Amino acid sequence: MTKPSYYITTPIYYPSDNLHIGHAYCTTIADSLARFHRLKGEDVFFLTGSDEHGLKIQRKAKEKGVTPIQYVDAIIANFKLLWERLHISNNDFIRTSQERHHKVVQDALQKIYDQGDIYKKNYKGLYCVPCESYWLERQLDENGCCPDCHRPVEEMEEESYFFKMSKYQDWWLQFIEEHPDFIQPASRRNEMINFVKQGLEDLCITRTTFDWGIPVPFDKKHVVYVWFDALLNYLTGIKYGVDDEFFHKFWPANLHLVGKEIVRFHTIIWPIMLHAMGLEMPQEVYGHGWLVVDGDKMSKSKGNVIDPLGLIDEFGADAIRYFLLREINLGSDGNFSRDALINRVNADLANDLGNLLHRTVSMIEKYHGGIVTDTGASEPIDDELKALIKETVANYVKAMDNMEINTAIKGVWALISRANKYIDETAPWILAKDEAKADRLKTVMYNLAETLRIVAILISPYIPTTSPKIYTQLGLQVPEQFLLADAEWGKLPNGTKVCKGEPLYPRIEVTEDGATIIGGKRYEHKAAAPALKEEEKPAMEPIKPEITFPDFEKIDLRVGKVLEAEKVKKSKKLLKLQVEIGNEVRTIVSGISQYYEPEQMVGRNVVVVANLAPAKLMGIESCGMLLCASDGQGKLALVDPTELVSGSRVK
C-alpha cells in the first residue's frame, strides 16, 4: 500500500547575516509539522534552504573583499550548524547558487518567455535593496520608505524584462474566491485581496546593474530578479524536470510556511508564475506572525537580536523548541522572553513531565524491582485515565491537522497533569504497605508507565530528543520512527524492566545577578548594554608608539575555525584549541578560559596571528595567537570574522 505523501517547505533564508531566533521559530514550526506527518505514517518531504543571489549579497561581499560565493558559503555553514543543533529533520537543503536550481529557473523563464508572457522595456522606479522589492510611489510608507522594512528606497533606471502579472489579475481573484483556504490565516487573505484589487502591475524579473544572479537564457547580459529565482526552489527541491515520478509524488505542495512579511510574494507572484507554467497550485500558504523580544521587534540597533545557538548551549534544543511551539499562537505575533522561557521549562518540562517520569520509574524500581506488570486489578479511576488518553489523542490529531500546535501541546500537558494527580489519588506508597493490595499496586504502576509511553509518542514532533529518553527509562527499544498507531492503550509489554536515568530537565535556578545554574553549571546572562553617553565612555588605553607600514606587513593575520577545545589542566586561564587555518590544523593555547567555555569555541571563526613563532605554555607548544579586543580592565572579547572562510587573510 502506497503511503500518503506530504510536502512542506520553509522560506529559503537570505544569507546576508547569521540567523536569529525568529528564523529558528519558523523552521521549528515546519519541523514539528513534518515530524507529525511522519508520525501518521506519511511519506514526508521537508525542504529548507538559502536564497543567495541579489544586489545586497553582491554589495556585502564587496565590502568584505571576497566573492559572493565565498561570502555566502561561510554564512550557510552556520545555517546548517543551527539546523543540526536544533534537530531540524529537513530532507534537503536547497541553495539557489546550485547548478540544479539554475537549470530549473532558466527552463521556467524560457517557457514563459516563449508563450509571450515576458517582454523587455526600460524600468524607472523605486527599489528596496534589503527586501529585493520594487515599489510604486503610492505604495511607500508615510516617510517615503519601503512599506515592508521602512528603509529608504533607491531610484532605479535600467533595461529589464517584465512578467505580465496584470494579465492574470482576474484569474487570481477567481482562484482565491474558489480556494479560500489557500491563504491562511484569513486576515492575510483579506490583505492580499485588497492589494490585488488596487491593480496588479507587471513584475520586473531581470536586472543588468549587477551580475550575482542566474543568467537569463535568452539575453545573457541580464540576470534573474531574486524573487522569480527564489520561489522556484520549491520545484527544484523535488526534482522538477529531472524525475517526473518523484516530482508528481510531492507536487502540489501541502504547505508553504512563511513569515507574514513575505506572504505577498508567495500568494500573488508564486501562483501566477505556476499558472503561467501550467502547474497546479500549492494547497496552502500560511503566513505566521513575527517573534518579538520582550515586546519589542528585533533589531541590531536595539541590541536585542537573539542568537539561537547561544540559547541551545545554555538551555538545550528541546527546551527552546518547546517554548517556541507552546508559547505562541501560530497566526499571531509571539513574544520571546528569557524569564518566560525559564518559567516554562521549570513548570512544564522539569516539574510536570520530568517529575512524572522520575516518580513513576522510581516507584516501579522500589516496589517491583523495576518490572512492569498489569494484573488487571482495575478500578473506575483507571477507566477515566484510559478514556482521557483516547480523547487526548483524537484532539491532538485534530489540532495538529489544523496547525493549532500549541493547542495540541496543551492537551498533552493536561494528560500529564492528570497522570500526576492519578499518583496522588491512588497513593502507591499506601498500597505498598498492604499485601492484599499488591495486584492493585502493580496495575497502578503499569497505568502510569503506559501513560508515559503514549505521551512520549505524542511529544516526539516537539521535543524529539526527549521521547527516546523516556522510552529508554521505561525499558523500551527506541523505534526508528515513532508512530501514532502505537498511541493506543495496552501496548506496553508485561515484564518490561525500567531503567531510571538522569532527570529529563534539571530545574533552572536564576541568581541575583541574572546568571542561570542548570545541572550544576553556571551560565552568565549578558544583557545588551545601553548606548553610553559621551561623558560615560571609559578612558582609552594610551596608544603605543607608531610603527612603519613595513613593520605592520610582517604580521600575517588569518581566519581560523576552531575544531576542538578543552581546558588546560592546572590552569584557570588557558584553553587548548585545535584550529583549522586553510588546509592545516594547529594547536593554539589561548588565555581566554575566563571568558569562553570550550563548548562556545567549537565551530567558531577566530582571527589568528599565523606567523608568530611557536611558544610553550604549560608544557604545550602553541603555534599562533588569537586576536582579541580588551577594554583596558583585562576583559577580553574575540574578534569575530564570522562571514569569512578558514584561511582568509585579514588586512
What are these regions (language model features)?
Residues 75-89:
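A glycine-rich helix N-cap at a beta->alpha junction
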Residues 115-169:
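Cys/His-rich short segments
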Residues 120, 327, 332, 340-377, ...:
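Helix-rich, typically C-terminal accessory recognition domains appended to large enzymatic cores
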Residues 1-2, 35-43, 64-68, 85, ...:
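Secondary-structure transition/capping motifs at alpha-helix termini
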Residues 2-75, 94-114, 131, 257, ...:
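N-terminal catalytic cores of NTP/NDP-binding nucleotidyl/phosphoryl-transfer enzymes
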Residues 2-48, 100-104, 148-149, 155-366, ...:
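Structured secondary-structure scaffolds
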